[in-house]
Amino acid sequence: MSNFSISAASNPIEKTLVLGGVKSGKSRFAEGLVQQRFDSLVEGADTPPTIAVIATAQALDDEMKKRIARHKDDRPAAWQTYEEPLYLAKQVRALADADVILIDCLTLWLTNLLMCDDDEMMRTEVDDFLSAVKDCSQPIIMVSNE
């Protein structure tokens, strides 16, 4: 993924989906996009832009705990992380004041919904999430496996 070059001077309310294989660097690539957006917003701003990271992973085993910790350590301290394994739409709407929202990762979120074994809840949450993304006036960068 390091061969990609993305300009931050694009539509300010764009929605971006970063796809890749497991451990392919997609989170790091998405974080680079967020950093580009941050850098473009910080110029001339009175206050630093707010970056909201919605993490959907659940630390259910040692390997996942280590991965979550590594991701947190890799991000700038000023980025606010919100852990939300199920109710993603509610969290997106709650972050209406953020300048940029990063969601990592949709694959884990869908897996979490499937594990609830409640088809109606899953359909409702997916529909609500799609509406929340559509209605969101901030750029959203989303990460998912292929």
Task: Specify the residue positions occupied by each region the protein language model found.
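Short, glycine- and charge-enriched coil/turn segments that flank and shape catalytic ligand pockets
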Residues: S40-P48, A94-A98, C116-S131
